[in-house]
């Protein structure tokens, strides 16, 4: 959705007996699914911090057929490109914060933050942000969600530094789950040295949104996780509050 109001309207429009699903492609990344399993199994205790970093080199690098564009040409196009227009909903925050906010809500079993603070870059001649840092205050402490148009490399090709993905901090350990990785890296009280755990293969009928939704319908089960409208609504509330926080340059309570 483009706003909390639109998200609530979508939920209200869902006919009785029908299913509304919101697809997040990162939900089908096996490392992130494995991280959720380990959290649910209690490996790291209660999740008390989430750090996410999401982005890419920038939208103008990704033309049809993945035609490569030079950095000089990208910079030349930025001031006039619709990607970089506020009225078009441009910017790294609106592009990527939904992933960190929604999957972060999933990892926290639906818990919402109390307050949100967001700071964005302000590049002369560019209407929208290319870098946003969002701090969410939860009852258990702070979490950080960062978005970037301008990573050194695209994470689906070569993971940049900082790496794109999630670090989950729990009362009994930590999990680092990077986008598109074949394993997660774990610390626990029993084994504090960071060590890899192989990512689980995605199960049959759970490899993508269509398989998952059809399976839930066939089993008469509700959707869970990021595809659940309630989880995505919390993510949207974080996004909208962050955008308004950046505009007002102050901390705000989470939007209802």
Model-derived regions: residue spans:
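ADP-ribose/adenylate-binding Rossmann-like module
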Residues: 1-3
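A short helix->loop->beta-strand "cap" motif at the edges of active sites that frequently abuts
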Residues: 16-18, 141-142
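C-terminal helix-rich "cap/oligomerization" subdomain common to oxidoreductases
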Residues: 6-12, 19, 127, 212-256
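Contiguous beta-strand/loop segments that form the cofactor/metal-binding neighborhood of enzyme cores
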Residues: 69, 95-183, 200, 207-222, ...
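A short glycine-threonine-serine/GTX helix/turn-capping micro-motif
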Residues: 87-94, 195-204
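Alpha-helical structural signal in soluble globular domains
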Residues: 6-16, 38-41, 137
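Predominantly a Rossmann-like dinucleotide-binding segment in NAD(P)-dependent oxidoreductases
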Residues: 18-21, 26-124, 249
């Amino acid at each position: 959705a483009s706003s909390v109001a639109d998200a609530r309207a979508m939920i209200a429009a869902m006919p009785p007996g029908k299913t509304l699903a919101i697809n997040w492609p990162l939900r089908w990344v096996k490392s992130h699914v494995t991280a959720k399993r380990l959290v649910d199994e209690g490996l790291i205790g209660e999740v008390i911090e989430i750090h996410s970093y999401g982005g890419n080199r920038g939208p103008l690098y990704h033309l049809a057929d993945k035609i490569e564009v030079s950095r000089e040409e990208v910079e030349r196009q930025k001031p006039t490109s619709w990607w970089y227009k506020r009225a078009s909903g441009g910017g790294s925050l609106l592009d990527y914060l939904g992933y960190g906010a929604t999957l972060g809500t999933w990892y926290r079993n639906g818990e919402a933050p109390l307050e949100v603070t967001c700071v964005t870059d302000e590049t002369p001649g560019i209407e929208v942000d290319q870098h946003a840092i969002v701090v969410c205050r939860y009852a258990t402490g702070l979490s950080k969600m960062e978005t970037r148009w301008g990573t050194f490399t695209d994470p689906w090709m070569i993971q940049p530094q900082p790496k794109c993905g999630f670090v989950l901090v729990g009362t009994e350990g930590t999990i680092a789950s990077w986008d598109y990785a074949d394993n997660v890296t774990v610390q626990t009280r029993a084994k504090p040295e960071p060590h890899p755990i192989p990512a689980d293969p995605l199960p049959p009928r759970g490899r993508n949104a269509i398989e998952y939704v059809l399976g839930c319908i066939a089993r008469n089960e509700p959707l869970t996780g990021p595809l659940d409208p309630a989880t995505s609504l919390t993510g949207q509330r974080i996004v909208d509050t962050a955008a308004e926080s950046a505009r007002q340059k102050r901390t705000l309570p989470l939007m209802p």
